[in-house]
UniProtKB/Swiss-Prot annotation:
Cellular-component GO terms for this entry: cytosol; plasma membrane
Name of the protein in its database record: Transmembrane protein 88
Keyword field contains Transcription regulation: no
Alphabetical list of InterPro entries matching this protein: TMEM88
Keyword DNA-binding attached: no
Organism of this sequence: Homo sapiens (Human)
Length: 159
């Protein structure tokens, strides 16, 4: 078996054994693909949650910057028909004041959603690509002598 960079020599019965190089390469590609898919789903979920919760503050800031005479001097009908500069200033101030609490709320809801979906459990470490697990040895059953009765033990010790 060829040496795998970063892999340790396995002592028989000591732990996981290194994979073959081709098997290691294929597992590394699959692990990378799975981790990239999980990361893309995380990013999509983050954008969806942040976009939904921060929408009121972003809308206020957008109209405030778009219609205030100090910034873009837009003469669009929605800007001139409804508010003047003091109203757009109020939109800017309210948007900035709402931004931080809504951001905290959005990040808390994203964290809760990630914990509920257990997305961190979907990430696979690269050590799984380099090493293959050994099967745990089966426990040997002790046979009772023909004349004695076998008493089932639960594995608990009462002291």
């Amino acid at each position: 078996m060829a040496d795998v960079p970063g892999a340790q020599r396995a002592v028989p019965g000591d732990g996981p054994e290194p994979r073959d190089p081709l098997d290691c390469w294929a597992c590394a590609v699959l692990v990378t693909a799975q981790n990239l898919l999980v990361a893309a789903f995380n990013l999509l979920l983050l954008v969806l949650v942040l976009g939904t919760i921060l929408l009121p503050a972003v809308t206020m800031l957008g109209f405030g910057f778009l219609c205030h005479s100090q910034f873009l001097r837009s003469q669009a009908p929605p800007c001139t028909a409804h508010l003047r500069d003091p109203g757009f200033t109020a939109l800017l101030v309210t948007g900035f004041l709402l931004l931080v609490p809504l951001l905290v709320l959005a990040l808390a809801s994203y964290r809760r959603l990630c914990l509920r979906l257990r997305l961190a459990d979907c990430l696979v470490p690269y050590s799984r690509a380099l090493y293959r697990r050994r099967r745990a040895p089966q426990p040997r059953q002790i046979r009772a002598s023909p004349g004695s009765q076998a008493v089932p033990t639960s594995g608990k010790v009462w002291v």
